[in-house]
C-alpha cells in the first residue's frame, strides 16, 4: 500500500493524487517537518498491519524490481535496510554538490562500512524498517528529529542496517542556494544534537560490544566535511609561515583528505560540470557560514 502525506500541497495536486490507488492523508501543520508527517501516517495504521515501512520523498522514483529486492532482503533477516539514492538531474552547482556529497556518504558511510562488517548509515529516503519496530519507536520521537535519532535507536538495540548498493532510488528535485544553506545548517545542527544526546552512552557501547553504535557516535565527533576542508585549507596556508615540519603535517592531512574524497566520488559524476561545481565550493561554504551566523543573531 502507498500512503502519501499531503502537507500544504495545492488543492489541484491533492485532486490529482486522489485519482491514484493510494491512501492520501491531508495535513496542514503550522510547522511542517518530515518526522511529523511520518508520525501522523503511522499513527493511523494498525499494529501488525504490514511487515515493512518504506520511507520515500515526494520526488523519488524507483526501478520496477525495487520493492521485490527490498522484500527479499527483509525476508532474509534484515530488519533495517538503506538503498542507494542517486540524484538523477544535476543542472546546477548546488545539485551537483548535493549529488557528490550523497555519493561520498554512500561510498564511506554505507558501502565502506558494510564491507567492514559495520552497520550502514541512514539517509532519510529509500529506507525500509520493520513495521512493528518502527511503529513502536516512532511515537517516542520529537517532531524535529531526523534519521540520526532513528539510527541511534536501531543501533542501541543491535539492529544492523543493511545497504543495497545496486538498488537505486532516483531523486529528481533540484534545490537552490537558499535551500542548500538551510539544509546543510540543519545537518550540522542535528549532527551535534545527536552527538551530545548519545556521547554519554559511548563507554557503555564499547564495553558491551555495541560497536556499530560506538562507531556512529565517534563519527558525529568529526567536523562536517565543508568545515573540515576549510580548517585544513586555513592551517595549511598558515603553516607555510611557520616551521617546515608543521607545514608538511598540514599539507599532508589536506592531500589525504582530498584524495579520500576523490576516491569516494564515482566516475559518473566527474564530467564537464564537475570542475565548475568544485570552483563554487568556497563561495557556497562562505554563504553557508554567513547564513548560520545570521540565523543565530535572529
Predicted regions and their residues:
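Basic/Trp-rich segment in TM-proximal cytosolic loops or flexible interdomain/linker regions
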Residues: 116-117, 175-261, 265-282
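Catalytic donor-sugar/metal-binding loop of nucleotide-sugar-dependent glycosyltransferases
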Residues: 151-170
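Acidic donor-binding loop at a coil-to-helix junction in glycosyltransferase catalytic cores
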Residues: 144-150
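Long helical/loop segments within the catalytic core of UDP-sugar-dependent glycosyltransferases
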Residues: 26-37, 47, 69-143, 185, ...
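Hydrophobic targeting segments
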Residues: 1-6, 24
Amino acid at each position: 500500500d502507498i500512503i502519501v502525506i499531503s502537507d500544504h500541497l495545492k488543492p489541484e495536486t491533492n485532486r490529482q493524487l486522489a485519482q491514484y490507488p493510494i491512501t492520501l492523508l491531508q495535513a496542514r501543520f503550522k510547522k511542517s517537518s518530515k518526522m511529523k508527517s511520518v508520525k501522523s501516517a503511522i499513527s493511523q495504521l494498525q499494529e501488525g498491519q504490514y511487515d515493512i515501512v518504506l520511507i520515500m520523498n515526494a520526488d523519488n522514483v524507483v526501478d520496477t524490481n525495487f520493492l521485490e529486492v527490498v522484500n527479499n532482503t527483509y525476508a532474509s533477516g534484515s530488519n533495517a535496510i538503506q538503498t542507494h539514492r542517486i540524484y538523477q538531474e544535476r543542472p546546477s552547482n548546488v545539485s551537483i554538490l548535493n549529488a557528490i556529497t550523497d555519493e561520498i556518504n554512500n561510498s564511506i558511510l554505507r558501502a565502506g562500512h558494510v564491507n567492514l562488517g559495520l552497520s550502514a548509515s541512514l539517509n532519510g529516503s529509500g529506507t525500509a524498517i520493520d513495521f512493528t519496530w518502527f511503529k513502536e519507536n516512532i511515537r517516542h520521537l520529537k517532531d524535529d528529529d531526523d534519521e540520526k535519532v532513528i539510527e541511534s535507536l536501531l543501533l542501541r538495540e543491535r539492529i544492523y542496517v543493511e545497504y543495497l548498493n545496486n538498488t537505486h532510488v532516483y531523486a529528481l528535485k533540484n534545490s537552490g542556494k537558499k535551500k542548500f544553506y538551510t539544509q546543510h545548517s540543519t545537518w550540522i545542527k542535528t549532527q551535534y544534537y545527536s552527538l551530545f544526546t548519545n556521547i554519554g552512552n559511548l563507554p557503555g557501547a564499547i564495553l558491551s560490544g555495541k560497536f556499530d553504535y560506538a562507531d556512529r557516535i565517534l563519527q558525529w565527533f568529526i567536523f562536517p566535511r565543508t568545515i573540515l576542508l576549510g580548517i585544513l585549507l586555513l592551517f595549511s596556508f598558515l603553516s607555510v609561515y611557520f616551521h617546515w615540519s608543521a607545514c608538511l603535517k598540514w599539507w599532508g592531512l589536506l592531500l589525504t583528505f582530498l584524495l579520500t574524497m576523490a576516491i569516494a566520488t564515482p566516475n559518473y559524476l566527474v564530467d564537464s560540470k564537475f570542475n565548475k561545481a568544485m570552483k563554487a565550493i568556497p563561495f557556497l561554504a562562505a554563504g553557508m557560514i554567513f547564513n548560520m551566523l545570521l540565523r543565530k543573531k535572529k
